[in-house]
């Protein structure tokens, strides 16, 4: 599976207008102008030349604009709106300076001001209670009023790309049209103080008659003496857009945050900066509000779409956003994306701000798909928007990219909100028929019968299902399995299992990790018996503080009837706790995430007072995760022991010359490339006495295997084995194993 290295990034997003004129091409840093401004015969051959590129600057400077268009008039805006023939005419240099202390323009909208979504204020307000005449304040250089928002410039009118209604795989927000505040109430998110600001400039060339002669050029500038260190290794996200795309009462996606689907997608211009200010991605894209019930939070998540209808030269994002991310089917670096998400940490938005990202990172090398993550900070129209995690998005494009397959042959199903049956997220409604066939098979057959178990192996990837359950159970994720239960398959030519195909194209179901925000101590602590939660046999969609049901647990319960699967699951659980969930490994990963976002915590708390933690409560939330990591394994050992009537826990110690070779225990290579293994020459793991462990010696080039020397510490007996692959039953006091190479 893929190996993800997490690293911070900067993004800048700018709302752009689509160009429907034939032959319209993108110029770097430019957006297409409003088609209403272009006469039928006008050719957009001109361009605006900026004296400075988008970046971070430590000192203020004078920005100069020029054009090579004869008699061309440059007009510009500084608020994210598109220049028109009524915008200020450029006559002299524009001072780009540190804007510290300037009044907020967009950030000071209190909850409920916009009815459904409350703008940057929160989810307050109910439909039908919208106050009229709301205006977003405009700085010098602005020309667009909110009244113009009923026909927002930049609406996606590209008829070449179909727009099916409501194709979002996420749950809808509360209600069909309106919204409510998070956790049932209105929540103001007006910043405690003025937020840090950059400057965004949009400029275009016009004729004396008012025709637009160029694309709209966009630049973002961040000026501060400490800008290079202000956010540490974090990047910057700047969203520059016509504010009507966000706040218009009828069409704004913030004002109507519970709406979903392509009708609620708005055009943007997207720029991605690395932490040193280097611009690495800049292109036209679309944006929607992302998420389910978290849409009503003050800090909303955003989802970005790369399409040729927005940018013909850049229909995909071509950049290695996630350093070291490889495809799921091979070791190729993944540097092409159709969709990305700026996630505000979901239910953890008032906790650590990285909980789900961390938990997915911890298991990204297991037999499960995960969403790569990279923390960043975001701005909108130059104003600080908050800490976000850049994430991959699960959809047909994700699987097409990760597995080099046709996305149209991908089926993604999801069990959500305590429902007993899944819904189709990607694919066709007829894809449910194969799921029903599989579910009925498990419902009607006991896996204690070996022939039934072998048939079950044609429906599900057993290695994947084990790792998937281990990740959710260990993490104490109770927002599952009757919610956030997502699985996919490749639709084969014969419609079912194809044993002769590559493993990822064989037609079996595979589960993916999604939205684990309730885990690692958010909604329950390290003592939670999530194993019992995952084996619930009641029909209810809820079990205490969580989602589970007999329907959602059926497959796992049935598989555990098979003694071979049960033994493999127990050993695999121990393998993963000894490596991926090694307490020291997890604590280090938590520390890395904490260090990355720490520079922006105070600004985050200022931006969303009362809803996002201040530094002290944030550090407390992070410390709680560390404590979870330190104590969880002990509780899980007890739950496994009780459920499966296991003996005591003992140490298995493996010794070898790591320069000559390594030992594999079950399916885990004890090498220093494996998570949780710091010393491959002398490694110890915890397993249950009386269980059988598979061991295999692997010699490195230039070396050969000689023998295993196995010592039962309770009996004091030593046995030598010449076979490089053996099975050892653990003694009651532990077992010591040495692999000898030559």
How should these model regions be labeled?
Residues 79, 343-347, 558:
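Short strand-loop junctions, especially beta-strand C-caps/beta-turns
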Residues 245-246, 252, 257-422:
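Conserved ATP-binding subdomain of kinase catalytic cores across diverse folds
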Residues 60-62, 91, 198-200, 218, ...:
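Extracellular structured ligand-interaction cores
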Residues 101-115, 232-240, 296-310, 408, ...:
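Short, surface-exposed secondary-structure junctions/capping segments
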Residues 1-9:
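Bacterial N-terminal signal peptides that target proteins for export
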Residues 11, 15, 21, 26-267, ...:
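Short, compositionally stereotyped local motifs that mark structural "simplifiers"
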């Amino acid at each position: 599976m893929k190996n993800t290295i997490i690293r911070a990034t900067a993004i800048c997003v700018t709302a752009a207008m689509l160009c429907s004129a034939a032959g319209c091409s993108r110029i770097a840093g430019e957006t297409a102008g409003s088609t209403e401004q272009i006469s039928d015969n006008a050719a957009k051959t001109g361009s605006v030349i900026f004296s400075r590129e988008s970046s971070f600057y430590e000192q203020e400077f004078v920005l100069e604009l020029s054009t090579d268009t004869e008699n061309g008039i440059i007009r510009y805006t500084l608020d994210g709106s598109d220049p028109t023939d009524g915008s200020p005419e450029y006559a002299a240099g524009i001072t780009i300076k540190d804007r510290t202390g300037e009044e907020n323009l967009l950030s000071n909208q209190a909850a409920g001001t916009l009815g459904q979504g409350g703008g940057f204020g929160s989810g307050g307000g109910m439909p039908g209670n919208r106050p009229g005449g709301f205006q977003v304040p405009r700085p010098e250089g602005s020309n667009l009023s909110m009244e113009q928002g009923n026909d927002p410039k930049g609406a996606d009118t590209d008829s070449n790309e179909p727009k099916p209604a409501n194709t979002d795989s996420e749950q809808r927000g509360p209600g069909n049209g309106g919204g409510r505040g998070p956790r049932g109430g209105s929540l103001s998110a007006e910043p405690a103080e003025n937020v840090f600001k950059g400057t965004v400039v949009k400029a275009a060339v016009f004729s004396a008659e008012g025709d637009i002669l160029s694309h709209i050029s966009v630049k973002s500038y961040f000026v501060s003496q400490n800008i290079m260190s202000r956010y540490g290794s974090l990047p910057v996200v700047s969203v520059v857009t016509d504010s009507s795309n966000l706040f218009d009462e009828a069409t704004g996606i913030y004002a109507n945050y519970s709406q979903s689907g392509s009708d609620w997608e708005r055009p943007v211009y997207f720029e991605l900066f690395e932490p040193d200010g280097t611009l690495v991605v800049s292109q036209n894209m679309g944006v929607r509000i992302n998420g389910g019930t978290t849409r009503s939070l003050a800090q909303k998540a955003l989802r970005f779409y790369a399409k040729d209808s927005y940018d013909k030269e850049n229909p995909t994002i071509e950049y290695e956003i996630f350093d070291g991310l490889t495809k799921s089917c091979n070791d190729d670096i993944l540097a092409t994306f159709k969709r990305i998400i700026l996630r505000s940490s979901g239910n953890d938005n008032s906790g650590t701000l990285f909980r789900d990202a961390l938990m997915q990172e911890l298991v990204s090398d297991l037999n499960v798909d995960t969403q790569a993550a990279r923390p960043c900070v975001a701005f909108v129209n130059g104003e600080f928007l908050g800490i976000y995690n850049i994430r991959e998005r699960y959809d047909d494009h994700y699987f097409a990219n990760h597995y080099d397959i046709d996305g149209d042959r991908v089926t993604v199903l999801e069990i959500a909100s305590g429902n007993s049956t899944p819904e189709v997220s990607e694919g066709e409604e007829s894809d449910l028929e194969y799921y029903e066939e599989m579910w009925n098979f498990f419902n009607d057959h006991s896996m204690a019968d070996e022939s039934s178990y072998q048939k079950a192996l044609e429906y599900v990837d057993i290695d994947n299902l084990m790792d998937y359950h281990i990740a959710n159970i260990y993490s104490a994720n109770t927002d599952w399995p009757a919610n956030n239960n997502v699985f996919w398959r490749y639709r084969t030519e014969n419609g079912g299992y194809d044993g002769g195909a590559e493993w990822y194209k064989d037609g079996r179901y595979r589960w993916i990790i999604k939205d684990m925000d309730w885990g690692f101590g958010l909604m329950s602590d390290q003592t939670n018996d999530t194993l019992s939660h995952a084996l619930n046999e009641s029909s209810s969609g809820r079990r205490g503080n969580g989602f589970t049901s007999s329907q959602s647990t059926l497959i796992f319960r049935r598989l555990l009837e098979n003694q071979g699967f049960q033994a493999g699951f127990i050993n695999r659980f121990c393998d993963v706790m000894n490596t991926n969930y090694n307490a020291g490994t997890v604590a280090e990963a938590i520390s890395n995430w904490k260090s990355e976002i720490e520079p922006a915590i105070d600004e985050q708390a200022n931006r969303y007072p009362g809803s996002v933690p201040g530094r002290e409560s944030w550090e407390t939330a992070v410390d709680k995760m560390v404590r979870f990591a330190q104590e969880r394994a002990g509780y899980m050992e007890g739950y496994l022991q009780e459920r499966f009537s296991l003996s005591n826990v003992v140490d298995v110690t493996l010794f070898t010359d790591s320069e000559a070779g390594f030992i594999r225990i079950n399916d885990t290579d004890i090498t220093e490339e494996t998570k949780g293994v710091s010393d491959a020459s002398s490694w110890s793991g915890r397993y249950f006495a009386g269980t059988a462990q598979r061991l295999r010696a692997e010699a490195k080039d230039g070396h050969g295997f000689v023998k295993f020397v196995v010592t039962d510490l309770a009996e004091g007996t030593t046995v030598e084995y010449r076979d490089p692959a053996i099975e050892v039953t653990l003694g009651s006091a532990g077992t010591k194993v040495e692999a000898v190479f030559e």
